[in-house]
């Protein structure tokens, strides 16, 4: 199974002790996900992040409703966490979120290893562009959210 890699970095003008807690709240993912995906966290509150935590979502990809379940496999506040898809739209989705203090703010890095259903052809036709578009939206929202905070 061929894996594909996606990486993104974003510097936020806020300290890590303010940025990481935002990511610690699973429901904030709804705010960071483009509206066209109709993303919804299904796991009841409160969601306490820890290794082994399972989180269920509902999402629409190209109009097709999909349930997605991830597991938090690494939880190391305030430095990093890793979520891995157990069921959902991918054969593999392994997402490492890293937070580093830099230049008076926080460098947020996303490293994703993934393998879409349909393999390289689907990645080339749809998936890569979708992932890039989703992360661009996410970065724009994060800049809006953390630029407003005082």
Q: What do these predicted regions represent?
A:
Residues 12-14, 61-63, 89, 114-116:
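Beta-strand elements of well-folded, non-transmembrane domains
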Residues 40-87, 107, 144-149:
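Glycine-rich portal/gate segments that line the openings of hydrophobic small-molecule binding cavities
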Residues 9-13, 40, 58, 71, ...:
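Generic structural detector for well-ordered beta-strands
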Residues 1-50:
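Hydrophobic ligand-binding cavity/cleft-lining segments
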Residues 82-133:
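Beta-strand/loop substructures that line and gate deep hydrophobic ligand-binding cavities in soluble
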Residues 19-23, 29, 55-57, 72, ...:
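Hydrophobic pocket/interface hotspot
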Residues 5-7, 65-69, 91-95:
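Short, surface-exposed coil-to-beta transition loops
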Residues 133-141:
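A non-catalytic, amphipathic alpha-helix used as a structural packing/dimerization or gating element
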């Amino acid at each position: 199974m061929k894996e594909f890699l996606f990486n993104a970095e974003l510097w936020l003008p806020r300290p890590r002790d303010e940025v990481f807690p935002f990511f610690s709240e699973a429901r904030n993912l709804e705010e960071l996900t483009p509206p066209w995906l109709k993303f919804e966290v299904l796991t009841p509150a409160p969601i306490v992040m820890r290794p082994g935590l399972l989180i269920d979502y509902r999402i629409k990809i190209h109009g097709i409703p999909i349930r997605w379940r991830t597991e938090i496999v690494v939880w190391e506040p305030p430095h990093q966490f890793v979520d891995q898809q157990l069921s959902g739209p991918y054969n593999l989705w392994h997402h490492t979120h890293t937070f580093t203090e830099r230049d008076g703010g926080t460098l947020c890095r996303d490293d994703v290893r993934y393998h879409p259903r349909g393999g390289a052809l689907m990645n080339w036709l749809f998936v890569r562009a979708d992932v890039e578009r989703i992360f661009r939206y996410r970065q724009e929202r994060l800049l809006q959210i953390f630029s407003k905070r005082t």
